[in-house]
């Protein structure tokens, strides 16, 4: 069984939220131990024609891009330990996509509030976020994702170190979560001949409520 995943993600993406909740359910409610390495990918960069020649991660004003501030905060949170990062990562996604309230990822007060709620040292986080190396890391991860795996959207999951799969889902019911995980891993890793499986929209996702 695959027990390590690399996932390219953008906090602005609701399907990243759904995958994160699904994986958390697998761990906390299904007893499946899977390590997840979350890596930043900038949807604003992928969807931009970049007419100015400036990459999203090089923009000076962190309040302009949708999620650059949150991505930098995520990398800074990793410096306080994997457990605290995972808590922060999940809480940011829940705040943005699961709270039913408007939550701007480019608002410093929002980021710092979630950081405190996640048990992070706020002063250290703010200091680490000033490290320009984090912007460079975001740029490198995004560029490598495109170059090495052809990543175009989020979440894209690397399940065996080489085969990438873009996964767009609603949150699976708990009783189906483990079976779906095994099925996805099997298709992503053992069926390299599969290029795309996509439901017509509509009728999907009519009838689903999450």
Region spans (language model):
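Conserved short-loop catalytic and cofactor-binding motifs
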Residues: 11, 61, 126-129
